[in-house]
Amino acid sequence: MANALRIVVVGGVAAGPKAAARARRLAPDADVTIVEKDKLLSYAGCGLPYYISGMVKERKDLMATPIGVLRDPEFFANVKDITVLNETEATEIDRSVRELVVRHLPTGATKRLPYDRLIIATGAEPVDPPIPGNDLENVLRLKRVEDADRFRELMTSRTCPMVTIIGGGLIGMEMTEAVTECGSAVTVVEMLPHILTMLDADMAALVEQHMRQVGVKVLSSTRVERIEGDEQGKVKSVVTSAGEFPAQLVLISVGIRPNVELARNAGLI
């Protein structure tokens, strides 16, 4: 529609689609566009551990509505009247002319999207501590569906009987449960005095007691010094301040940091 309000949302996983849908309800005549760097969008990131464990049976269930309709670009176009540009990275906010510069990743083609309102919902990335060996094969992080695909593949292959999880926060605990249900032995390494540091120590102790009862080894107040690999470049053990522990798979889960580069480069923060 000519002279319609132009609303552009950067980020298409969690907050972005919610903001776009809300904008559509508040401004039914607006042009609403979501820009998402990855191919998949509007998926249940909190469900990734349960997809790995098999509780979520199929990949598509992470991206489906309660009635099983896949939330893909066609869904947003046909049901929500929202345009989705996936596999498209927002590279620059040109505030002087109110335009967002984007690049289509498969082709490298760039273009400018004019906006009247710009919503930045770029989410966060896993913190990657400078641990020697963190680039070995089978040293993973959990952020995207593709990460969960790889983790689930390794779990179902039964080639990783011993798994080390670095970090005892919420994601680390959910992944501990998932990996245990897959039948692998888990060692959790936490640098701080107890796991789940958002809880009081006595409450965290109850969780830790349960974990030990189901066979999980918990090492608190323990630093990871390095990750050792074999001749093929695959992880074989984790060396900590409490000793060396064999592992065929390592998850680094020590927190997240917000993706603020786009906003910072635009002088917004």
What are these regions (language model features)?
Residues 2-85, 178-199:
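Beta1-alpha1 glycine-rich phosphate/pyrophosphate-binding loop at the start
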Residues 2-10, 70-162, 237-244, 251-254, ...:
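FAD-binding core/adjacent interface of flavoenzyme oxidoreductases
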Residues 11-14, 143-144, 167-169:
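Glycine-rich Rossmann-fold phosphate-binding loop(s) that bind the pyrophosphate
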Residues 22-25, 47-51, 99-101, 132-136, ...:
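Short, glycine/charged-enriched secondary-structure capping and boundary segments
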Residues 29-33, 85-106, 113, 181-269:
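A Rossmann-like FAD-binding core segment of flavoenzymes
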Residues 48, 52, 129-131, 139, ...:
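Short clusters of hydrophobic/aromatic residues that line enzyme substrate/ligand-binding pockets
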Residues 146, 150-199, 203, 235:
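Rossmann-like NAD(P)H-binding beta-loop-alpha module
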